C-alpha cells in the first residue's frame, strides 16, 4: 500500500513557503538514495491533482514531490518569475533527502517550467513535459503580462545529457501539438517524443497508459529500482 503523502512547507529561494506533498519510494536497501522527481502542475491547478502520478512514481522506486507553486493552491504570493526559484527549491529539497538523481515531470505551464529549469540544477538527469505551454500563448491566456520570458529553445536544445521526454495530445485545444513536435525535433539525445491521437490539453495527465510510459521513462533514465510497498 502506498503511504499517505507527507505534508511539508519548503522555503523557496526567496523565502516564500511552498506547500507540498512528498511521497517516499518503497522499502528496501538504498531508499535514501533513490531518485527523486518533482511533479509540476499547470496554470490554475494545484498539487492534489497530481497525487495519482506521484503514487505511481513512488511505486516505481522514486521519491515524488508535488508542490503548489506560488499563487496556486495553499501557497501564497503572486504568480511571477519566482516560480523558477520554487522549482529549484523543490529539487534542492529532494537533494537534501539524499536522492541520487533528480527529474521533473510537468504538465502545460509545469511542462514549460520543467524544460526551462532542468539545465539550472546540476543533479537533474531527466524530465517529462506533457503538452508544454509556450510563453506567449500562456501570457495571452492569463490575460496579463506573463512574467517568465525565458525562451524554451535554448534550454530544450542543449546537449547536456539530460533525457527529455515529450508527450502531447493531437487534440489539444490550448497548445498546438506542432509546437512540441518542433521543440522535440531539435532536442539532443537522449529524447523521446509521442504525439497521441485525440485527447485534449489535460487528458494525458491521468491516462493510466501515459502515466506508466512516463514513469518508466523517468525510472530508466534516473536509475530507479522497483521497491516493495511500505
Question: Where do the protein language model's features map onto the residues?
Answer:
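The serine-hydrolase catalytic nucleophile loop
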Residues: 43-55, 178
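Short beta-strand/loop motif that positions the catalytic acidic residue
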Residues: 159-161, 166-168, 172
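Alpha/beta-hydrolase active-site loop
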Residues: 49, 78-97
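Primarily recognizes the serine-hydrolase "nucleophile elbow" in alpha/beta-hydrolase
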Residues: 90-150
Amino acid at each position: 500500500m502506498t503511504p499517505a503523502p507527507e505534508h511539508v512547507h519548503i522555503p523557496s529561494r526567496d523565502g516564500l513557503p511552498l506547500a507540498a506533498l512528498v511521497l517516499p519510494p518503497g522499502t528496501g536497501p538504498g531508499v535514501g538514495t533513490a531518485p527523486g522527481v518533482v511533479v509540476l502542475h499547470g496554470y490554475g491547478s494545484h498539487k492534489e491533482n497530481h497525487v495519482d502520478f506521484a503514487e505511481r512514481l513512488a511505486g516505481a522506486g522514486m521519491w515524488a514531490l508535488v508542490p503548489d507553486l506560488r499563487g496556486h493552491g495553499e501557497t501564497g504570493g503572486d504568480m511571477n518569475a519566482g516560480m523558477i526559484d520554487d522549482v529549484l527549491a523543490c529539487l534542492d529539497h529532494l537533494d537534501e533527502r539524499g536522492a541520487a538523481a533528480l527529474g521533473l515531470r510537468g504538465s502545460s505551464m509545469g511542462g514549460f517550467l520543467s524544460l526551462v529549469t532542468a539545465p539550472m540544477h546540476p543533479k537533474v538527469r531527466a524530465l517529462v513535459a506533457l503538452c508544454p505551454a509556450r510563453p506567449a500563448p500562456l501570457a495571452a491566456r492569463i490575460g496579463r503580462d506573463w512574467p517568465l520570458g525565458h525562451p524554451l529553445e535554448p534550454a530544450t536544445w542543449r546537449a547536456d545529457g539530460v533525457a527529455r521526454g515529450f508527450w502531447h495530445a493531437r487534440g489539444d485545444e490550448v497548445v498546438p501539438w506542432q509546437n512540441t513536435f518542433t521543440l522535440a525535433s531539435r532536442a539532443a539525445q537522449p529524447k523521446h517524443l509521442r504525439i497521441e491521437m485525440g485527447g485534449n490539453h489535460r487528458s494525458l495527465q491521468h491516462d493510466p497508459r501515459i502515466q506508466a510510459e512516463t514513469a518508466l521513462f523517468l525510472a530508466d533514465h534516473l536509475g530507479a529500482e522497483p521497491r516493495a510497498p511500505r
